[in-house]
Amino acid sequence: MGKIIGIDLGTTNSCVAIMDGTIPRVLENAEGDRTTPSIIAYTQDGETLVGQPAKRQAVTNPQNTLFAIKRLIGRRFQDEEVQRDVSIMPFKIIAADNGDAWVEVKGQKMAPPQISAEVLKKMKKTAEDYLGEPVTEAVITVPAYFNDAQRQATKDAGRIAGLEVKRIINEPTAAALAYGLDKGTGNRTIAVYDLGGGTFDISIIEIDEVDGEKTFEVLATNGDTHLGGEDFDSRLINYLVEEFKKDQGIDLRNDPLAMQRLKEAAEKAKIELSSAQQTDVNLPYITADATGPKHMNIKVTRAKLESLVEDLVNRSIEPLKVALQDAGLSVSDIDDVILVGGQTRMPMVQKKVAEFFGKEPRKDVNPDEAVAIGAAVQGGVLTGDVKDVLLLDVTPLSLGIETMGGVMTTLIAKNTTIPTKHSQVFSTAEDNQSAVTIHVLQGERKRAADNKSLGQFNLDGINPAPRGMPQIEVTFDIDADGILHVSAKDKNSGKEQKITIKASSGLNEDEIQKMVRDAEANAEADRKFEELVQTRNQGDHLLHSTRKQVEEAGDKLPADDKTAIESALTALETALKGEDKAAIEAKMQELAQVSQKLMEIAQQQHAQQQTAGADASANNAKDDDVVDAEFEEVKDKK
């Protein structure tokens, strides 16, 4: 078996590593660097440049130089975050025919996986140059909070690059593998804080060692997949643009060339301010007007940068609290804090994380390389080169289906270890229903409409039967890559239907954040809605059973009683369409009061049936002259 390489496909930079025996090794690219900018350029003469060569020519070719494509992968054009990027990116972001976010370069429409594949090809070539043999398999990392669509799109990018993606692995988990592999014996609980170029993740991971085998178990994960170094850069760029506008009266946003130079300068200044207290952004001939050329020379202090991005850093703290809560731990239970991603080099980020956990983060993990190393380790586990390592990851959000009353019924709860499979039996809501629609949802709210729809499909050919009788088995299966497969089967007819969640119906990052926040903020509203649905279902059942009893009673039910019951049934039916739980309960009570005569008739009929049954049994026993008899009680199926 050939080598399975480990690739960290980052928003800003990418990195590739392999297992050299039992030691992971980060590989240098053709330019001699251990990381490669995730930048792709299409030149005027038809050449495709990747990495540092693409970055070097960006200033002269801004519209055809693509960066931060990971922010678009597996996303819809109408997503709020994509729309924000549309206004600030120098290249053209467009809507594909299926509604996905694509880019247009020199009149050609391109999907994000196509573009990311160019970076993966360079990673593949770097590994092949080092190994001297073809490479066809890889483990690729994604943010822990990436959804089905984004994971699927990342696998597609690998396939386009000529790689069979053996496993998609979460970035914080990969970093934990890199950290934990060479550490001594003993059990540890670590927090991996991963703030990269475009995404943020926090994972709480337990490393256990039993008889020489290390188990890496993710207890909980949280994050924000639209928060990263690119956002920090944008804040500084906006500040510099406004300062220049105040000074010169010229808005640089209308000049793509100037904005590209400014982007490079802002990124450089941000990095310098991690070690220096102040820096100069000096850009001669940044633009010109009728009076001549204009130069930018603005002093930026570390304090100024921190004031510009403080709210971004604070945004990363809330997911830390949720992850700890989900893991059932407090900050004192965390033994080590690992920082991953280039943006964690910022002193303010390190300070905030240290304040939250009450301990200094470890400095012996390379934030740019740890994720690729972990991916290579996972590759080694899959080939058998790395033994005695078990990785247990989780799904970041709850998954379920819409059931009667517009409720989401959860089949797999968030932070469930994957791969996992869960089945549950549901039934029909109407008599003689021949088809059911399986509506797949992702999120934490009780009301189906408040969660993200991942897709839906129909199961047809159900045999006619009273409501509640057919048995529809719904199965959710999440594979090791975190990708969801759903099937529904009619246990009576054997008919089955399956769906794999496709890239066109994934969640976007902010929606995930919003779902969890909404679930916490709206816990009381959710509880009330759940109670309303329960009451509605009770009312619906009462409606159904009362109508059946009226039918069975026939002429035995006096006309006055029948009229009163019909009136109460209509009133209850109207109340069930509303949102008032108390009104439904009141109408149920009224129906019960006017149905007393009906209940008496029903009880009499039931007693007569039992008496008739007992008499028949006695006569049969006498006729057959049977001395010993065995009786088996047959209970009605509910």
From Swiss-Prot:
GO terms for molecular function: ATP binding; ATP-dependent protein folding chaperone; unfolded protein binding. The modification Phosphothreonine is found at T199. Keywords: Acetylation, ATP-binding, Chaperone, Nucleotide-binding, Phosphoprotein, Stress response. Residues 602-638 are annotated as: Disordered. The modification N6-acetyllysine is found at K109, K245, K304, K421, K556. InterPro entries: ATPase_NBD (IPR043129), Chaperone_DnaK (IPR012725), Heat_shock_70_CS (IPR018181), HSP70_C_sf (IPR029048), HSP70_peptide-bd_sf (IPR029047), Hsp_70_fam (IPR013126). Residues 602-620 have a biased composition (Low complexity). Induction: By stress conditions e.g. heat shock. Pfam families: HSP70. It comes from the Bacteria. The keyword Oxidoreductase does not apply. NCBIfam families: PRK00290.1 (NF001413), PRK05183.1 (NF003520), prok_dnaK (TIGR02350). PANTHER family: HEAT SHOCK PROTEIN 70KDA. Belongs to the heat shock protein 70 family. Acts as a chaperone. This is Chaperone protein DnaK.
